[in-house]
Amino acid sequence: MIQQKVLFISLVAVALGLGLGLGLKESVEPQVSCRYRCNETFSKMASGCSCDDKCTERQACCQDYEDTCVLPTQSWSCSKLRCSEKRMANVLCSCSEDCLEKKDCCTDYKSICKGETSWLKDQCASSSAAQCPSGFEQSPLILFSMDGFRAGYLETWDSLMPNINKLKTCGTHAKYMRAVYPTKTFVNHYTIVTGLYPESHGIIDNNIYDVTLNLNFSLSAPTMTNPAWWGGQPIWHTVTYQGLKAATYFWPGSEVKINGSYPTIYKVYNKSIPFEARVTEVLKWLDLPKAERPDFVTLYIEEPDTTGHKFGPVSGEIIMALQMADRTLGMLMEGLKQRNLHNCVNLILLADHGMEQISCNRLEYMTDYFDKVDFFMYEGPAPRIRSKNVPKDFYTFDSEGIVRNLTCQKPKQYFKAYLAKDLPKRLHYVNNIRIDKVNLMVDQQWMAVRNKNYNRCNGGTHGYDNEFKSMQAIFLAHGPGFKGKNEVTSFENIEVYNLMCDLLKLKPAPNNGTHGSLNHLLKNPFYNPSPAKEQTSPLSCPFGPVPSPDVSGCKCSSITDLGKVNERLNLNNQAKTESEAHNLPYGRPQVLQNHSKYCLLHQAKYISAYSQDVLMPLWSSYTINKSPPTSVPPSASDCLRLDVRIPAAQSQTCSNYQPDLTITPGFLYPPNFGSSNFEQYDALITSNLVPMFKGFTRLWNYFHGTLLPKYARERNGLNVISGPIFDYNYDGHFDSYDTIKEYVNDTKIPIPTHFFVVLTSCENQINTPLNCPGSLKVLSFILPHRPDNSESCADTSPDNLWVEERIQTHTARVRDVELLTGLNFYSGLKQPLPETLQLKTFLPIFVNPVN
């Protein structure tokens, strides 16, 4: 036994000796790193630093504890330190080896940990086809809104936003996208997803009163989710109604049970959710099995709008907000690339409106105009006024009196007051009971408020006229459906709904957009528009003798040979063809009104379509060169005669215009454009007459006598088409003859509510309108026909100080003119129809920048 113990001790001694001799020792080195140790259980027996969640309290954490164990719970990015990290339950995203399998990698995992090229550093995609992984038969569409992203930000600070700049470079972008009026958040977001103007979808502002509901709408009121406020069909319903799936990560209207349903997936708005969490959730939706995966997704972030409101659009803070928005886009694109979806998904990045600088030194107070402000006012950059006692006094409120008291009261006012019916037609802001009758159009950087208690006047705001440059929004698009490296002209956001439907191969619901007008953004347009079909062909108005007896009351003592003068109206076929080539170079305006009775009247210098329903031309068309004649015409009272081609019963008479009336005869084709007396006599006929308010003729005559020759010189000639508009019910569409009779029952000759003018020239001004092989350029106006010029405070002002500004205020799209007249322009153009639609939806901008 003793021998055994001695042997055991000897063996231990030998073993220890060998161990010491060979340098072997027990693994008891103190721990110095948290790598693979985060959230381990604390042990008093362990040597070295700790990595449990209480180590900071004991001041025993390893030096890399914050970077290794804390930062992953706060960061949405990988780092070299995090690569191959041990899986932790509470991280925002993972950089572990199994994260791809678990589908919870940080979006930059492959570029940071696997050495792959990031999306930002990739070359622009060169393939013309979608490159989608298995299971994606159709490209998903993501609609991403960055609230308040003014188009000018991208012009000024593009180098500070590398991700957005790459999207712009590689995809399709517009210099800007035009918001609808008022340029507010809910208004424009809902327009984008319905294709409807606010007057059509009902969200006419962020704050609304509806007398029929007797309810108020605001962004914070519980009534906001009442479906009665929300009209139209938002894109997420169009998607689901046609068998696809839609998911919305915030969008105005998406959490409302519109038409009885919600999007397939939706989130209740919560502004505290980080942008990165929103992107991560969107990416998870794209990871879903095919049967659950959405085909359409919205994503919304509040920046740079929130910062713009607080600090204004020109500030260091706005740059930081833009960089945050840029990083959010970068995170989305990296996440798409990690899923091999970056060249599969179609992405539209846009904004709802821009942002403008404001100051408490630039306020207009209603107390300066009224002894007592006894009404309710929606204050700010897009003010409206109504009765404060509603619903009782809603309909009896003296809106006209309010407008009078706010018109031409100071030498310099920073707003103009309008009845809604007199607002520029381009705004499409009248045809809804929720739009109050009194509206103030406020100058840039100014606001109109009740009194001096108003204090929300520093920083930035929006809501102004949508023609102001500061209100312009961004539009960028990227993906296999869009052309690459493509810049397009500006367009209005009502067109985006149709565009999205085309990308998803859906049939759009009725909307205010012009379907096909954005085909030039797409590689392979899904929808090919068809030409409008004329509903009514012209009748014949043959040349005939002067009626006897002549009861027209017209006279012209300067005509010595009436037969010879009238014979000039009897053009043969060759002369008619020559007249059409000169006066209708882009085809005859087609009449889309049903049961309209009219005939074409050819003269050498102009052609008109005379309506036997309203006893005046529907339109008159002529072409003037860069140096039109400016001889003084005979006055209408001295020289007018019946058009012998029009039966007396279907003609205006001079006796319709009595000196004591406010209405006077005006001409569509100016007689003074004739280069000889005979050519002027061709225009001094009753078929060229339109009834005009005497006050309006000041504008009309200055426009034709001064501005039209000026524009002709600048554009190397013009084709001019003008005519009356009848919109008595203010719905933005032409009134039928029966509707006109409802409003005008005391005369056979109705008074137009507006007049339109469409000026067309060659884009390349080397060429004339008659010889234009390339693109056309258009300038069109819809001029309210009002009895006075109080809109311009022009009673004592020379015409040159106000007329041009007035007509520029009332610029319009050709498409607006078409809707209000029932006419179809440019029917003779040989170019593809989508190019013509671009021309028709173009809106010129005249607003001068703020000094």
From Swiss-Prot:
* Listed GO biological process terms: nucleoside triphosphate catabolic process
Q: What does this protein do?
A: Hydrolyzes ADP with high activity. Shows weak or no activity on 5'-AMP, 5'-GMP, 3'-AMP, ATP, cAMP, and cGMP. Is devoid of monophosphatase and proteinase activities. Dose-dependently inhibits platelet aggregation induced by ADP (IC(50)=0.99 uM) and collagen (IC(50)=1.4 uM).
Instruction: Give GO terms: molecular function aspect only.
Output: ADP phosphatase activity; metal ion binding; nucleic acid binding; nucleoside triphosphate diphosphatase activity; toxin activity
The source's domain of life comes to Eukaryota
* Active-site residues per Swiss-Prot or TrEMBL entry: T185
- Quote the CDD domains the UniProt record gives: Enpp (cd16018), NUC (cd00091)
Q: What is its EC number?
A: 3.6.1.-
Instruction: Indicate the quaternary assembly.
Output: Monomer cleaved in two subunits; disulfide-linked. Is synthesized as a single-chain protein and is subsequently cleaved to form a two-subunit protein held together with disulfide bonds.
Disulphide-bonded residues: C34-C38, C34-C51, C38-C69, C49-C51, C49-C62, C55-C61, C62-C69, C78-C83, C78-C95, C83-C113, C93-C95, C93-C106, C99-C105, C106-C113, C124-C170, C132-C344, C360-C457, C408-C793, C541-C599, C554-C654, C556-C639, C762-C772
Q: What is its main location?
A: secreted
In which tissues has expression of this protein been reported?
Expressed by venom gland.
One Pfam match, by short name? Phosphodiest
Q: Which residues are glycosylated?
A: N39, N216, N259, N270, N405, N512, N594, N745
**Location of the motif Cell attachment site:** 58-60
Task: Identify which cofactors the protein needs according to its UniProt entry.
Answer: a divalent metal cation
Where do the annotations place AMP binding? K271, H309
| CC cofactor note | Binds 2 divalent metal cations per subunit.
InterPro entries assigned to the protein according to its UniProt record, in alphabetical order: Alkaline_phosphatase_core_sf (IPR017850), DNA/RNA_non-sp_Endonuclease_sf (IPR044929), Endo_G_ENPP1-like_dom (IPR001604), ENPP1-3/EXOG-like_nuc-like (IPR020821), His-Me_finger_sf (IPR044925), Phosphodiest/P_Trfase (IPR002591), Somatomedin_B-like_dom_sf (IPR036024), Somatomedin_B_dom (IPR001212)
- Summary of temperature dependence: Optimum temperature is 60 degrees Celsius.
Which locations, inside or outside the cell, does it occupy? Secreted
For this chain, the family text in UniProt reads:
Belongs to the nucleotide pyrophosphatase/phosphodiesterase family.
| Keyword Aminoacyl-tRNA synthetase attached | no
- Can you say what this protein is called? Venom phosphodiesterase
Transmembrane stretches in the record are: none
Residues making up the signal peptide according to the UniProt record: 1-23
